[in-house]
Amino acid sequence: MALERTFSIIKPNAVANNNIGAIYARFESAGFKIIAAKMLHLTKEQAEGFYAEHKGRPFFDGLVEFMTSGPIIVQVLEGENAVQRHRDIMGATNPDNALAGTLRADFADSFTANAVHGSDAVESAQREIAYFFAADEIFPRS
């Protein structure tokens, strides 16, 4: 297996519900190292830019509105096969379909307010990490 980095967001509902620590505990117990993290409140422009690939889809405006509704936590996770393993612990996008014990099964409020975001490929992880973090904000830990 290859050591990878993936990008993760703890969404506004999970921040508001005080689930940050529980989610971080899951990341660490799954073997991820958190090598960059920050809390921020997205502007409409930042959210639209981040989710630009979804522009024109029926859910886009609601997603932007939700993602700007409160603070989020963005982080870079590092570990073996990080992209897929992070997707596995997140669970299905629709929390109604998420397996018990996954982040979305445990912390999501709805399809849009599904607690977490994670990169879907190594290439998108690189792009998403660069959207929120400068190279000097990432601290690999061995």
Curated annotation (Swiss-Prot):
* UniProt-annotated catalytic positions: H117 (pros-phosphohistidine intermediate)
Which cofactors?
Answer: Mg(2+)
Gene3D superfamilies from the xrefs?
Answer: Nucleoside diphosphate kinase-like domain (3.30.70.141)
Recite the UniProt keywords alphabetically: ATP-binding, Cytoplasm, Kinase, Magnesium, Metal-binding, Nucleotide metabolism, Nucleotide-binding, Phosphoprotein, Transferase
EC number(s) on file: 2.7.4.6
GO CC terms in record: cytoplasm
Q: Where does ATP bind?
A: K11, F59, R87, T93, R104, N114
* CDD domains reported in the protein's UniProt record: NDPk_I
A molecular function annotated in GO for this UniProt entry is:
ATP binding
Q: Is Cytoplasm tagged as a keyword?
A: yes
Role noted for this protein: Major role in the synthesis of nucleoside triphosphates other than ATP. The ATP gamma phosphate is transferred to the NDP beta phosphate via a ping-pong mechanism, using a phosphorylated active-site intermediate.
The family note in this entry says:
Belongs to the NDK family.
Assembly:
Homotetramer.
NCBIfam families for the chain: PRK00668.1 (NF001908)
Q: What is this protein called?
A: Nucleoside diphosphate kinase
Gene assigned in the entry: ndk
